[in-house]
Amino acid sequence: MFDRAQSTIANVDPEIWQAIQQENVRQEEHIELIASENYTSPAVMAAQGSQLTNKYAEGYPGKRYYGGCEYVDIVEQLAIDRVKALFGSEAANVQPNSGSQANQGVFFAMLKPGDTIMGMSLAHGGHLTHGSPVNMSGKWFNVVSYGLNENEDIDYEAADKLAHEHKPKLIVAGASAFALKIDFERLAKIAKAVGAYLMVDMAHYAGLIAAGVYPNPVPHADFVTTTTHKSLRGPRGGVILMKAEYEKQINSAIFPGIQGGPLMHVIAAKAVAFKEALSPEFKEYQQKVIENARVLAETLVKRGLRIVSGRTESHVMLVDLRAKNITGKAAEAALGNAHITVNKNAIPNDPEKPFVTSGVRLGSPAMTTRGFGPQEAELVGNLIADVLEHPEDAATIERVRAQVADLTKRFPVYR
């Protein structure tokens, strides 16, 4: 039926093939500093592009609504067993198609519309799914938000007071733009004191946690959700880890609650990524991620930029650009012209609009994957500062772009 020699993307759909090739070139020739992006291994991509994409498998291993699932059962069980071993979890669901759907699955399992939840404010580094009014979490539930204190660390005392005042049914921990270590044990004590569930969204920190270089929330939380890409370096998808007593409720919430047939090719890719993350090499990689982030942040500070919270203790940092009189939007564009990819991001109490912002978010996972070390991280920090000091100077942009080209040639991703 299918002629492998002829059924290539290039032959079947030249337009898509061209876009893919252009994106391949961009990934090779640009320095990727978006904190939520990374490069998956060829093995992960091969699993995701396998024949498993053809198989419907509604249900769970050993209990499917379709025949012919004996081999995908093996795949899903391996993914479950590996992610449990990776994080020390009692139970796991590997079917969520995204981190947002993983969060939604917990909400659907444990809450009713109108219940009160408490999460970190999006304006202070939280995530849309932690109660933002534009997200379903903010529309379905009564939301109380906690944020940062004057030192730009999480205000645990204020969170404690809010929890006792509002008695939320569920407290959400985790962030999308927060550089310090989160005290999950302290938040668990707050939740226990008010009779709330604790859900930790560790999407940004999962790879660091797997390697033991960032605090593990699993011993303290009722539920832990995550994406499988970002610092974990797997395919795009989600996972829910939970205490064994909640496994049946969570499984029912995912299927048939909010999803139908699982994406078995993606679950296979998750399993491969989990196996990679269980290796000693992955721990070494994450240690380098932390070191590169520290060097990058220190370099930017030396060049007159302010890092929100004063430092980074993880892979991510939020850079306040106001000292350079440039917005996040303009900085993103200028750095993009120099082939350095970042994303504009609001800083705490940002006076600018969300699509403009006063900051950019930077992360070290992708550049570390391609082999950058502290020396390269320092150089990247100086290149960023050069662009931000002269964002409209063509000569500066051209010089930085040439230095980026030299770096990316010396440290290829897939070539």
From Swiss-Prot:
A single Gene Ontology CC annotation of this entry is:
cytosol
E.C. number, please?
A: 2.1.2.1
Among Gene3D superfamilies, the record links this protein to: Aspartate Aminotransferase, domain 1 (3.90.1150.10), Type I PLP-dependent aspartate aminotransferase-like (Major domain) (3.40.640.10)
The superkingdom of the source organism is: Bacteria
Which cofactor is essential here? Answer: pyridoxal 5'-phosphate
Entry keywords, A to Z: Amino-acid biosynthesis, Cytoplasm, One-carbon metabolism, Pyridoxal phosphate, Transferase
Q: Which InterPro entries match?
A: PyrdxlP-dep_Trfase, PyrdxlP-dep_Trfase_major, PyrdxlP-dep_Trfase_small, Ser_HO-MeTrfase, Ser_HO-MeTrfase-like, Ser_HO-MeTrfase_PLP_BS, SHMT-like_dom
Protein location: Cytoplasm
Q: In which pathway does it act?
A: One-carbon metabolism; tetrahydrofolate interconversion; Amino-acid biosynthesis; glycine biosynthesis; glycine from L-serine: step 1/1
Q: Which residues carry this modification: N6-(pyridoxal phosphate)lysine?
A: K230
Record-level GO BP terms = glycine biosynthetic process from serine; tetrahydrofolate interconversion
Location, primary (coarse class): cytoplasm
According to UniProt, the reaction catalysed is: (6R)-5,10-methylene-5,6,7,8-tetrahydrofolate + glycine + H2O = (6S)-5,6,7,8-tetrahydrofolate + L-serine
Q: What does this protein do?
A: Catalyzes the reversible interconversion of serine and glycine with tetrahydrofolate (THF) serving as the one-carbon carrier. This reaction serves as the major source of one-carbon groups required for the biosynthesis of purines, thymidylate, methionine, and other important biomolecules. Also exhibits THF-independent aldolase activity toward beta-hydroxyamino acids, producing glycine and aldehydes, via a retro-aldol mechanism.
Member of which family?
Belongs to the SHMT family.
Give the PANTHER family listed for this entry: SERINE HYDROXYMETHYLTRANSFERASE
Return the protein name: Serine hydroxymethyltransferase 1
Provide the gene name from the record: glyA1
